[in-house]
């Protein structure tokens, strides 16, 4: 706050201000007081407790990770190092139909719930209890939580290989309503996965009518991102339109070599839908994805790395084909012996990834899996990879546009009030970085590596990281759905 002598808390001097709106960068000073941005402009005569000389450095809003599985990472006063170290100040959780709450498990979580962690994490009968635990021991960054459809199915159904009955939909609706009342910003589905694959569109629409009543958002890991990707897009548009909710297509991609190039068609479909309804999408800057180990995904991939394996933890980080050769067995037999497990799948093309990233409606979402023993490098490197590789090296789009995709666009999409833009009165979530040096250093071989070029990160006005090293402050907040 401003003290009795008119001093600010923090003053960034002579920064290259990229405000998040897509407007051209400009040189100026930015001052913070308490948890807010207090002044912007030529503040040459101003005083502050902390002065940061930012000549040649970009000051932008803190990055908003539009697609995460950080539901467990944010608990226990977490440093959130994989995210904060790369400039992320807010994470959107509860994606792909899976959230830790509202669900209590007495046995190991079935896939894909195991992507979030072990049984111990599923201990919240109410979504409000989960949010209360985050607030009681805050993490380093902000949390914008969603509730997952698959989580609701597991909580209310005795068999998941069928459509929900009307009684089960009513039970899911009660849990969903409680979650939205507690502050969930949206609802997600993961119709690709076995636990939700049997859910018909009508089941989703029944639940979306409740989401609409609360003014919340719908995000989906679609039923098919392979041969039927266009049909799945049409299903998603139809569900959102009939449910009267804004839609986000999660980690949009075209999987499998036979589908490379289809992003021309899928993005045209998205553009057409956007003339009739609110549709957004997120993506990450890699040709490989990651999820649970499944034969169907292996068949679509040119290479598969094992991220974790319950029966064989020593195998993590190794190529599936090498494992099969070592064990003198088929790839299918190796999959069976490794499961339950997670994997990294190389199944996209650079051209599709770049085309999708460049689309004006695309937000950046890491889709990282912090529970994985050998995670995909996107967990640590997605945002600096966009700013370094995509912007500086490939010139896919201007720096200002990249920052918009990471800040104002997700803040607007998810209704995160007073965040995502450098403006007086907004929350002081800020990142200072060197545009000539910012880069991802995490690789598929060594994924747990901090980004280069991130000089400072502030969350709600407090220093969260300096030169990539997370500080002691735990100033993150739960960002509940705006009324």
Each language-model region and where it sits:
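Active-site microenvironment of metallo-dependent hydrolases
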Residues: 1-28, 33, 84, 296-483
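Active-site neighborhood of phospho(di)ester-bond hydrolases with catalytic His/Asp-centered motifs
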Residues: 60-67, 92-95, 217-222, 250, ...
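Divalent-metal coordination cores built from histidine and acidic residues
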Residues: 76-185, 277
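Short, ordered loop/turn segments at secondary-structure junctions
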Residues: 96-97, 192, 222-224, 252, ...
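Short acidic, glycine/serine/threonine-rich loops at helix termini
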Residues: 101-108, 154-160, 201, 230-234, ...
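Histidine/acidic residue-rich metal-binding segments in metalloenzymes
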Residues: 163-189, 195-338, 344-363
């Amino acid at each position: 706050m401003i003290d009795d002598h008119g001093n600010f808390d923090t003053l960034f001097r002579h920064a290259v201000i990229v405000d998040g709106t897509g407007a051209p960068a400009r040189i100026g000073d930015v001052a913070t007081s308490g948890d807010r941005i207090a002044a912007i402009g030529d503040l040459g005569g101003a005083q502050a407790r902390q002065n940061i000389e930012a000549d040649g450095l970009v000051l932008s809003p803190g990055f908003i990770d539009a697609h995460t599985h950080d539901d467990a990472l944010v608990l226990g006063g977490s440093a959130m190092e994989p995210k904060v170290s790369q400039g992320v100040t807010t994470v959107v959780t509860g994606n792909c139909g899976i959230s830790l709450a509202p669900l209590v498990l007495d046995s190991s979580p079935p896939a894909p719930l195991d992507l979030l962690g072990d049984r111990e994490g599923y201990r919240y009968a109410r979504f409000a209890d989960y949010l209360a635990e985050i607030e009681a021991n805050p993490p380093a960054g902000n949390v914008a939580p969603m509730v997952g459809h698959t989580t609701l199915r597991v909580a209310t159904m005795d068999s998941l290989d069928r459509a929900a009955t009307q009684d089960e939909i009513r039970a899911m609706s009660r849990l969903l309503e409680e979650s939205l009342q507690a502050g969930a910003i949206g609802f997600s589905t993961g119709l690709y996965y076995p636990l939700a694959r049997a859910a018909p569109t009508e089941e989703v629409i029944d639940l979306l009518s409740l989401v609409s009543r609360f003014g919340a958002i719908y995000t989906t890991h679609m039923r098919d991102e392979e041969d039927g990707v266009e049909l799945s897009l049409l299903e998603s548009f139809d569900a959102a339109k009939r449910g009267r909710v804004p839609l986000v297509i999660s980690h949009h991609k075209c999987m499998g070599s036979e589908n490379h190039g289809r992003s021309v068609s899928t993005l045209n479909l998205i553009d057409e839908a956007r003339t009739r309804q609110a549709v957004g999408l997120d993506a990450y800057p890699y040709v490989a994805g990651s999820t649970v180990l499944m034969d169907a995904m292996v068949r679509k991939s040119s290479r598969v790395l094992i991220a974790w394996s319950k029966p064989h933890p020593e195998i993590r980080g190794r190529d599936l084909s090498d494992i099969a050769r070592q064990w003198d067995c088929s790839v299918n037999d190796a999959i069976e012996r490794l499961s339950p497990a997670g994997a990294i799948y190389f199944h996209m093309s650079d051209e599709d990834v770049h085309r999708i990233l460049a689309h004006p409606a695309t937000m950046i979402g890491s889709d990282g899996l912090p529970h994985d023993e050998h995670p995909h490098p996107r967990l640590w490197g997605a945002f600096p990879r966009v700013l370094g590789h995509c912007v500086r090296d490939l010139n896919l789009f201007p720096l200002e546009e990249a920052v918009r995709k990471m800040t104002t666009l997700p803040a607007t999409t998810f209704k995160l009030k007073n965040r995502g833009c450098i403006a007086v009165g907004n929350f002081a979530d800020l990142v200072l970085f060197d545009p000539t040096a910012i880069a991802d250093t995490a690789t598929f071989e060594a994924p747990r590596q901090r980004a280069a070029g991130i000089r400072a990160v502030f969350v709600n006005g407090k220093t969260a990281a300096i030169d990539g090293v997370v500080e002691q402050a735990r100033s993150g907040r739960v960002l509940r759905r705006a009324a």
